[in-house]
Amino acid sequence: MALVSQARSLGKYFLLLDNLLVVLGFFIVFPLISIRFVDQLGWAAVLVGLALGLRQLVQQGLGIFGGAIADRFGAKPMIVTGMLMRAAGFALMAMADEPWILWLACALSGLGGTLFDPPRTALVIKLTRPHERGRFYSLLMMQDSAGAVIGALIGSWLLQYDFHFVCWTGAVIFILAAGWNVWLLPAYRISTVRAPMKEGLMRVLRDRRFVTYVLTLTGYYMLSVQVMLMLPIVVNEIAGSPAAVKWMYAIEAALSLTLLYPIARWSEKRFRLEQRLMFGLLIMTLSLFPVGLITHLQTLFMFICFFYMGSIIAEPARETLSASLADSRARGSYMGFSRLGLALGGALGYTGGGWMYDTGRTLEMPELPWFLLGVIGLITLVGLYWQFNQRRIESAMLSGS
């Protein structure tokens, strides 16, 4: 037992460092895409939104297949291959001077994520015990926030010189992450049984409770992805400089590093997981309604704070609930399918968000996209409330134990 505990402990430290590299490499590049191609090159927001949505759709929509392959062949080969593929996507993005090249680069980056994301998520479940899982997710999310602001700072600084430097730096970090996994990641099996890929896929698809939960989250993700598209654009518009975007991520980092873990510890003893998820989504929804009417940067940052607070409350509960509902015989497949809501919500949020933003500007109604996003958030809340009351989930799962 002592050896098992030691292996779990070392594995969690490995996951934390690995996650830092992945987050840093991602946020050096992706928050700058909308600024580079919309603000600097003058492309239509819908074209850039389509590229970002394509990355999301490919990565998360095909995640169930990446997870099923990892269930069959193990985590390590999928993680290493996926990271190298993302590095190649970033290198191609540096050469994007036409929309189709950007779309191809984002698709390649998303395909890499399809391969490495589900097995990495399944490893978290494998290496953490149920009672500590929610807190470990909180630590990962705190790290995500810190990595996001550091990555955005580095990316913004590099963008002053050339967008090529932004992309190449992100690619190098993913190559380093791949090497880290080659060197130190053991050949873990992420599921309790090694079954054919089809069996894992069918096990997920027959689980109506899990499928309903995942698809309901589509609206939640439509809101959450706007930190990568419309929020950076509106911050840049009001501030008059892309340098202000880094402060948006600084706010997220400050709130996450100071509040995420304490809130998770406090709330897990007092509220059920679905209550935390819905309350966080409500705060996110209400904070988006007035954004289109704001003309001062300080006021905008205040509502962005509210949005991040909602995310801080909702995200650990959402991730823990997804892990609790996963069948240990097909962890990779379940974690891959759990990203389908993110795939649909991301594709709709990016593409639809870009279209709504362009339409709002054309009609001289800047509040239009934010009002529609708020309505989507309210509809999602109703869907979650119905699901959790019509399809009761075991209390042990919902309490996070």
From Swiss-Prot:
* Bilayer disposition of the protein: Multi-pass membrane protein
Alphabetical keyword list:
Cell inner membrane, Cell membrane, Membrane, Transmembrane, Transmembrane helix, Transport
Where does it localize?
Cell inner membrane
Q: Name one GO cellular component term.
A: plasma membrane
GO-annotated molecular function: transmembrane transporter activity
Extract the PROSITE patterns matched here: MFS
TM annotation in the entry: 13-33, 34-54, 99-116, 139-159, 165-185, 214-234, 243-263, 277-297, 299-319, 340-360, 368-388
Q: Where is the signal peptide?
A: none
Q: Which family does it belong to?
A: Belongs to the major facilitator superfamily. DHA1 family. MdtH (TC 2.A.1.2.21) subfamily.
Q: Indicate what this protein is called per its UniProt record.
A: Multidrug resistance protein MdtH
Origin species? Yersinia enterocolitica serotype O:8 / biotype 1B (strain NCTC 13174 / 8081)
